[in-house]
Amino acid sequence: MFKKSKLLSAAIFSAASLLAFNGQADTMGTPKISAMSILNGLENPWDMAFTKKGDMFFTEKCKGFSVKTKKGAVNKLYGMKGTSGYNSKGDDLFCEGQAGMLGIAVDPNFKKNRRIYVASASTKHRGSGCKDNFDVCNGNIIMRFEVSKDMKSVSNRTDIVTDIQYKPFESDHPFGGPGAHNGNRLRFGPEGYLWATTGDRHKGDIPQHPTLLGGNVLRIDTDGK
């Protein structure tokens, strides 16, 4: 009888503890998430990068990159071919499939050097490979810009990486059109290097190639080396 009573008491205590724990789980430590719109009317927004002051640079895949300043002004800085309204543009930049103007990153020393970095599809450095060689088509680049102090324009475009592979032809993969599996995310690491992800272009052997840059994670300095 003693053993049964002891077991029953233990069971009741355990059940009560479990109910109390579940009640706490519902009310304690549960984050409340809210959302608000800060920009409207964007077309395929792809990436964002912030200055330490809170200015937000962002890309639109088939248009260009802009900045929303801490004070709320939105300035369209650099567009691709066929766009309008940007302070300046590059006619070699284009949008196709999953490719376009994609990754963007702010230099850790932005306050001093005013530099940002942008990855995009480009015709500038393509060469003949994009016409007759599926493997060797250098159609993605990483650019470096300097932003004006009033945040209204960029200058001194420098293409610091020019030989990232691009998919120029249709293939038999699902969604296998030109520009597929393109990659191009940019981020700075804690040691000051710029990290870039590149796409495999639906070619499983590309990441294993000893010299081609597709299907890899690249670590480069701010000059592209």
Task: Show which residues each predicted segment covers.
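N-terminal signal peptide c-region/cleavage motif recognized by signal peptidases
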Residues: 15, 20-22
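Short, contiguous, pocket-lining structural segments
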Residues: 178, 208-213
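Short, intrinsically disordered, charge-balanced linker/junction segments flanking boundaries
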Residues: 223-225
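Bacterial N-terminal signal peptides that target proteins for export
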Residues: 1-10
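Acidic, Gly/Ser/Thr-rich repeat motifs that build Ca2+-stabilized beta-propeller blades
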Residues: 25-205
